[in-house]
Design a protein with these regions (language model features):
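Bacterial Sec-dependent N-terminal signal peptides
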Residues: 1-25
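N-terminal soluble domains immediately following signal/targeting peptides that reside
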Residues: 22-166
Length: 166
């Protein structure tokens, strides 16, 4: 009887561990730095590779392989389009064009490097970010903004895809 209880307790323990490892986090990190000497914003995005490929496949009805050896120039073009459609920055009330420079893979994360040019002064910045929100209701996109040493954070989600930083 004691042996059966011990086995049951161990079984419940291992099932609990397994359930915990299945749980996923749905978070993207977006670092936005104002570099006044260069009159630009420098943006670094960190998005989980599998989620990004799933979103691209869903949006464009084509299997993509961003971050994989099978990655094609067409995959990168679709990623650029997706970022442009889903991630927007308004400075002082005006929509700004983001320039995509490059991307790299670090473990299971895709890191993209973007800039916004011709930025002399920021009085307010509005961010619209709906990346991956079409896949996961739990998706959170964290915007970290550094404006001349003043740091601000903004948490966006599938229910709140826009926010203001001053």
């Amino acid at each position: 009887m004691k042996k059966a209880i011990k086995i049951s307790a161990l079984l419940i323990f291992f099932i609990g561990l397994t359930a915990m490892s299945v749980h996923r986090f749905y978070v993207g990190i977006y670092q936005v730095d104002f570099v006044p000497q260069k009159k630009r914003l420098e943006i670094t995005t960190r998005i989980f590779m599998d989620d990004l490929n799933d979103a691209l496949t869903k949006a464009y009805k084509k299997q993509t392989n961003i971050g994989d050896q099978k990655e094609t120039p067409e995959d990168v073009t679709l990623m650029k389009k997706y970022l442009s459609d889903k991630f927007k920055i308004y400075l002082n009330g005006q929509l700004k064009t983001m320039n995509f420079h490059s991307h790299e893979q670090e473990n299971n994360v895709i890191i993209c490097y973007l800039t916004v040019k011709e930025v002399s002064k920021i009085t307010k910045m509005e961010v619209e970010n709906s990346i991956l929100t079409e896949l996961h209701d739990e998706q959170q996109n964290i915007i970290q903004f550094n404006n001349n040493g003043k740091k601000q954070n903004l948490l966006l989600s599938s229910s709140t895809t826009k926010g203001m930083l001053k």
